[in-house]
């Protein structure tokens, strides 16, 4: 049923992939991405774990209304999260490459 190497080989391969995924997740948590809004007037840097590292607001926005600034901050944060998730997908794809997965199954679980 499992061919040469059998179930033991499959389990070893799964364990190696799990170790690689854990290492990759640790690396991803250390990466930093920056999201922007308002043509770069608001920038938010987050790490791969989506923790905010920095917020940069152009001084010209301090004179504008509060609601607009809040919207720009939210948009920049959402952009940063989207970029972090894209980066995570790219990094994790290298770990799962070569291992056949059943249809619909994705890593990380």
Curated annotation (Swiss-Prot):
Entry keywords, A to Z: Cytoplasm, DNA-binding
Intracellular or extracellular location(s): Cytoplasm, Nucleoid
Gene Ontology CC annotation, any one: bacterial nucleoid
Alphabetical list of InterPro entries matching this protein: YbaB-like_sf, YbaB/EbfC
Matching NCBIfam families: DNA_YbaB_EbfC
Assembly and interaction partners: Homodimer.
UniProt cross-references to HAMAP family, sorted A to Z: DNA_YbaB_EbfC
The protein's role, per its UniProt record: Binds to DNA and alters its conformation. May be involved in regulation of gene expression, nucleoid organization and DNA protection.
Protein name: Nucleoid-associated protein CGSHiEE_00780
Organism of provenance: Haemophilus influenzae (strain PittEE)
